[in-house]
């Protein structure tokens, strides 16, 4: 009887170990983050590109249009335009580095506008971008311009609630509020499968090693 109990306990422990190992492997796979680099120059020019081409230039609309453009460019070309870190806020994804840039110019950032961003745009009524220059198109590839133009065409005319709902995609819903959305999840939302995602990660690692 005791031998039988010991045997069963051993089997249970073995099965639990297998489950824990499987969960650990799955967690490792799920937490594999795409190695995306933030590009401040492209982000600034994406902002100017959008702000000069939409009628309503509020933060919310601009943030969402750039998010959709980043997502589409990732699907089409294997990398986003800006490489920003999107935070899953209640109203949808917010590009945190771009938001910091806007706050520098607005004057409520803990960082001063030491790089002279105010020569490119101003902030009016706390939440509207007034572009002072157009985008430097030499800083945005034709494919990046196309992704931004497509996002403007699809989403610029939507209301606040409509574009908010569109931005509440699977990548946003799978992330806790006020946490960063992983680029892996954005890639899956863009339609990339696991094999394509692994290829992108491998390419990013090789590119980083050669840079």
Task: Identify what each model region corresponds to.
Residues 5-7, 14, 18-211:
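Domain-edge interaction signal
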